[in-house]
Amino acid sequence: MAWNVDFYQDDDGKLPVMKWLDTLPEEVRGKVIARIDLLKEGGPTLDYPYTSQIDGRLREIRLRVGKTRYRVLYFFDDDRTAILLHGLTKNTPAVEEADKRIGSARMAKHEARLGSKRSAGARRGKGEGNK
């Protein structure tokens, strides 16, 4: 079964992971996209060394090219969609706390938006039944 993968969108409509991907050399970008495709195929069962848990539901897609490490922070939302939150390039093994905070904040914002959409849909559904 294929899983859905989507890019987190800022309030101003920008896609931060897409912007990060555009900064990568073409060869590396292709490899990162191939890992994203693996996530589409494997969903939450895709594990180390391709992905790993960061904190709670926050996970990372992992890729190393030479000495440089590339990561995409993501999580699975309640709609069973992997939301790509934050892309980073690093030379150290650990993900920096600042990057974790960015990923966590975007995850919380996405979940709040999803909750708002569901609440609005539930309210509309209740109103329609009373007509």
Tell me what each language-model feature is.
Residues M1-R69, D78-A82, T89-K131:
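Basic, Lys/Arg-enriched alpha-helical interface segments
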